Amino acid sequence: MRIDLHNFFQHFDPNNPKHVAAVEQLEVDLISKEPDLLEDTSNWVRIFRTKPAIPGVLPVPFYPQTDNYRDAQRTCNSSSCAMCLEYFRPGTLQGPKGDDAYVQKVFAVGDTTDHSVQTKVLEGYGVKSRFSYNLGFSDLDRELAAGRPVIIGIYHRGSLSAPTGGHMVVVIGKKGEDYVVNDPYGSINDGYTGPVTNGKGAVYKKSDLTYRWLEKGKDKTGWGRIFEAKK
């Protein structure tokens, strides 16, 4: 009976000496019988090392926070979560002000700035997520490639050398090396002086996010919400 290598490598444990010995034996056998399979130019190696394609822009709906029925100046977190909820569960929130229903649930539980409250409300809708304080650009790329948006917390005021503020936006795609976002308050590119719709699909430079998202540009210091839900 032929074995399925998927099952073997799915359960591979590098801390299990038997697993390690088995892989080493497989390598010895390949060298003796099919040495070309272990070359960098081998087709399976090329396929294995190919990074998954990152989609252009995920179709995440846009909800501005500026028309929220209450606390419009401070409900960026709730409107961002509402956008992702409607992406994962289309039809849950009705109409262009659908995030009002979400905001109402948030304030029934706690405060909009409390990330644990957002986690609880999202889970109540059947969308699992977790808030992390150690994300980097590789995490954004991985999630986007899997078809999942990421909510991140940025410094939206001040200069790049001394950023200030605190704001939540939804990363929905990439354009080259830069990131496409839904910013519920408008666009940081115009200093939030234009219409709020400028935040829909706004392109934020990676070089800017390096200092507005990451702590002093250090990798794995970004705040954000990762979703476990499937589209």
What kind of region is each of these model predictions?
Residues 43, 52, 56-58, 108, ...:
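Noncatalytic regulatory segments and standalone regulatory/sensor domains
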